[in-house]
Amino acid sequence: MVYVRYLLLVVVFGFAPAVEAQDESIDLEALYQQIDDAISQSPQYVAELEGRVTGSRDRLLREESLEKRIQIAEELFQLYSSYRNDSALHYAELCISLADSLRRPDLVGRFRSLLAYQCSNSDMDNESLEQLRLVKRSALDSLGLVDYYHAWMHVYGELGSYTQREHLRLDYFAQQDAYRDSVLMVADEGSEEWLHLKVDVLCARQLYQDALELSKEWLKKVTDGTHESAYAAFYCSMVYDRLKNHDMTCYWLGRSALDDIKCAVMNQASLLFLAEHLANDGEIDRALRYVEFAKACNLAFSPQMRAYQVNSVVNVIEKSSQVSRDQTRIILVFASVVIFLLLMALIYTIVFYRRRR
């Protein structure tokens, strides 16, 4: 996934203090405890989202106006986009059908682009390409162009990540870069699309301090506890990871994971990355709990989704666990040798004194 290429304090998370957290002491254990608590309350967060979904579905059934039906259908698509992939695909297709009934090629193209992105975000790259090739670019407005270029950028990134052929990988990533530049040209400066791509560009150029400053500005624009704040926090963690700041990387990964859980996001990524860091730090039990929760979420979002990523983290955990066992075994052997030598010394001393007597 795109994520593969490349996130709390005990007090309330105000944004100004949170953004400056790198200058303060942070309590990662308190953050992890908040994540543990949020995981235990996950059914409540899911029920809250289901309540919003039910309300929107009921309004859609009652609504007769095509214009309003398409608005509600898009609302349902957005609610499902990180919750249940099959339902998100269904409502994206409904949006396309309604837009076609309204004879709105601009909306048809935009919703096809959103459908294409949803497909490539759930390992359906061929279906994504199929939808994008049906879009009439000349009919798109500026918003539609952002979604269109963004979908192309994403699917080429996915293709580049998966292929084992080097020349194809280079070609796919070159196409991804070209569409990224197109998004930056048409997206509003300061929008979410513009911000995350700009952070990517700055990191690629190794301008990490500039990327960090932009990430701070982004965090000031989002509301704590939302999917948008989770997304911004993930990118902040990515910058700190490039800066080799382990604690701040884990901090922002934790912030991102916490918001994802509270928003009933099933398309989990941040928690998996955090679990990998924890495994490398030797916190095997907690890492396993996080992986199991993330795995269950991803299976609920889409079967087989990120299975390879879960397995990758599990492998890290197993290796860390093996290293821990090996270290324990070495310590036990060393301790046994020391005890044996001490016993031998004690026996020698006793025998020596008895002979002198």
Task: Report each predicted region and the residues it spans.
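Short hydrophobic alpha-helical membrane-anchoring segments
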Residues: 11-19, 346-352
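Alpha-helical transmembrane signal-anchor helices
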Residues: 321-357
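A "functional boundary" signal
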Residues: 2-6, 13-326
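Alpha-helical transmembrane segments of integral membrane proteins
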Residues: 5-8, 333-334
